A protein has these predicted regions:
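A short acidic, glycine-rich active-site loop
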Residues: 196-209
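Active-site gating/metal-coordination segments in enzymes
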Residues: 6-10, 14, 78-198, 253, ...
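Histidine/acidic-residue-rich catalytic or RNA/ligand-binding cores of hydrolases
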Residues: 44-48, 81-83, 179-187, 237-248
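Short active-site segment of divalent metal-dependent hydrolases/proteases
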Residues: 39-40, 174, 234
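Well-ordered, non-membrane alpha-helical segments in soluble/globular domains
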Residues: 50-58, 78-81, 111-116, 150-154, ...
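Hydrophobic faces of well-ordered beta-strands that scaffold small-molecule active sites
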Residues: 31-37, 68-71, 95-99, 129-131, ...
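H/E-rich (His + Asp/Glu) clusters that bind or coordinate divalent metals
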Residues: 2-13, 51-52, 58, 209-260
Length: 260
């Protein structure tokens, strides 16, 4: 009997022997509205204006059965103008969401800035708001503290969104494993070895449990604001819990965009 070679886990790439009938689904049974897309700064990490042809991209999506998309990269001000100009050839295909600059949180007149920006953006055509996980996990205030998503200083955003009837799509939490040590017990060990910057298991950063508590506070304290909690309601590892939230908070919706 030949001696078995020791194999590192990182070298293990097995090929499945499972034989199945191949079924190619070229189009969905029903028209699709993709509520989580990025056609601007977030999606292309910089100047997107020459990185895709709007007409060709839309044609490709329509052929695949996509009826409309929610473009979450509207931003605000001049950037919103650039985004709207980019998608103008097919503007009926796009539902664009904007946002505000939360890094200005501690500036004098922040509340006035938020109200004016959102009103101006709505007049330009945005249909909702988008907020990244940066609010709780990246951006810090003037006291060098991370900003809880349920922070009272952000209240003006949710109130104005309700007044203007703008739904808020918000990314709050990442996969639970991203908040745990990168060790042999972490189910995303291989992924985090390749992308260590995705780990939030660091001193001073909110835990996953704290973020979920903030998320509930946000929903509970702003009943007139319609929220779409991105990526399966922040907690795809526990859909029973997400289901309880959906039953408990009528203003909560979820999207099913992947967080890969």
């Amino acid at each position: 009997m030949s001696e078995t070679k020791q194999l590192l886990l990182s070298e293990y790439t097995p090929m499945s022997e499972l034989i199945l009938k191949e079924t190619i689904v070229s189009k969905p049974k029903y028209d699709v509205i993709d509520v989580h897309t990025h056609f601007g700064l977030i999606g292309f990490n910089g100047d997107y204006r020459n990185q895709y042809d709007t007409r060709r991209s839309v044609e490709s999506l329509r052929e695949a059965g996509v009826k409309k998309v929610v473009n979450l990269d509207g931003m605000w001000g001049n950037e919103l103008d650039r985004m709207l100009e980019k998608i103008k050839p097919c503007e009926d295909f796009f539902i664009t969401f904007g946002t505000v600059d939360t890094s200005r949180l501690d500036e004098k007149g922040f509340e006035t800035y938020v109200r004016n920006t959102l009103k101006e953006s709505k007049e330009k055509g945005i249909k909702g708001l988008k907020f990244l996980k940066d609010v709780s996990l990246v951006i810090k205030d003037s006291q060098d503290r991370y900003i809880p998503i349920d922070d009272q200083r952000l209240k003006v955003i949710w109130e104005t969104a309700a007044e203007l009837k703008l739904p808020v799509l918000i990314h709050i939490g990442d996969p639970v494993a991203f908040f745990k040590p990168i060790d042999p017990f972490n189910e995303r060990y291989d992924e985090l070895q390749h992308r260590p910057q995705w780990s939030f298991c660091k001193p001073g950063i909110f835990t996953f449990e704290q973020l979920m508590e903030m998320q509930e506070n946000l929903l509970k304290n702003n009943p007139d604001t319609t929220f779409i909690i991105a990526h399966g309601g922040s907690y795809t590892e526990n859909l029973a819990c997400v289901g309880e939230w959906l039953d408990k908070y009528p203003n909560m919706n979820v999207d099913i965009a992947a967080r890969i």
